[in-house]
Structure formats: structure tokens, C-alpha cells
Design a protein with these regions (language model features):
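Active-site anion-handling motifs in enzyme catalytic cores
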Residues: 1-167
């Protein structure tokens, strides 16, 4: 999905998060056109300590950046998966049903906002909630990720057995 219509609002929301966290912000592009979105966000927020990870990172490098973060403001499903696997608390801006379904499986729906309701004020309130519940979220994410990881491995084994039967 192209988020160019939301860029100015995203920038305002990122500034709100930056004011709360008082930490450098790193934008991790997970699809090719996200890099240009990151550049536009940086242009809109020249006063922020906002960095853009290289656009050609592999999945492992992206996961390592997220793993070493204290908080994720996430939109893309893969960034949410990386944060969940590493126990990094996050607030999700929901743009697609697949993201909603992932949050349900993680029991993290309360830490999300539908894209059409995203405002700096709403983001501030949700970030406060995530920060207040940080320890519980870390415990929850680690537990849910372990369960979902086992389900993924079982599914993989089923697919591999079906493929090997047809060969």
C-alpha cells in the first residue's frame, strides 16, 4: 500500500512519539517504496533526530534493528512480526485486515489504531498505554510468539510433506 496521502499526518504522529520517548527514531523501510516515504518524512521533520535505515537491508538486518529498539511504531506486518518475535513493545497503525488478524493472534489489539483514526493525540494516548504496560507486553509477546512459532513450524512440516508426496 502507498501511504503518500498520510505522510503529513504520519510526520505529526512521529513528532508526538519523539516528544514522548526522547530517543532517536529509526525508520526501517520493509518494502521498496517505503524508502521514499522515509525521505519525505525526514524532509517534513528537519528538527527531529530521525534516521532512515538503508533501503536494501535483508530481513535479518531489519529484524536486528527492530530487536535493538525499545519501542516500535509499526504499520507493515513484517515489522510487527519482528517486534513480536523479539518482545519489543509496539503500537500498530492498522491499514489492512492481515495486520488486524496478526494483532488478534498476538492479543495486542488494544495497542493499535485504525489508519483512518490516527491523529497525534490518539497516538500519544496509545503510546502512553504501551509504555505503562511495557513489562506485561514483553511477557505477552514472548509467550504468544513462542506459540505462534510452533504453529508455523507445524504448518511448514505439513506443506513439505504434501509437496514431497506429489514429487
Amino acid at each position: 500500500m502507498d501511504f503518500s496521502k498520510e505522510t503529513e499526518n504520519f510526520a505529526k504522529c512521529i513528532v508526538a512519539v519523539a516528544e514522548q520517548l526522547k530517543q532517536p527514531l529509526v525508520f526501517v523501510p520493509t518494502v521498496m517504496h517505503d524508502y521514499s516515504l522515509g525521505e519525505e518524512l525526514k524532509r517534513l521533520m528537519p528538527e527531529q533526530n530521525f534516521r532512515i535505515a538503508p533501503g536494501d537491508l535483508n530481513c535479518k538486518a531489519m529484524a536486528e534493528i527492530i530487536e535493538n529498539s525499545s519501542f516500535l511504531l509499526g504499520v507493515r506486518m513484517h515489522s510487527i512480526i519482528c517486534a513480536a518475535r523479539q518482545g519489543v513493545p509496539f503500537l500498530t497503525l492498522i491499514y489492512d485486515e492481515k495486520v488486524s488478524q496478526l494483532l488478534k493472534r498476538l492479543d495486542m489489539e488494544q495497542y493499535s489504531l485504525p489508519l483512518e483514526t490516527v491523529t497525534p493525540e490518539a497516538v500519544r494516548g496509545c503510546v502512553d498505554e504501551v509504555l505503562n504496560d511495557q513489562e506485561e507486553i514483553i511477557t505477552l509477546l514472548r509467550a504468544r510468539s513462542a506459540v505462534l512459532g510452533k504453529k508455523v513450524l507445524r504448518s511448514r512440516d505439513i506443506v513439505l510433506s504434501l509437496v514431497s508426496e506429489t514429487v
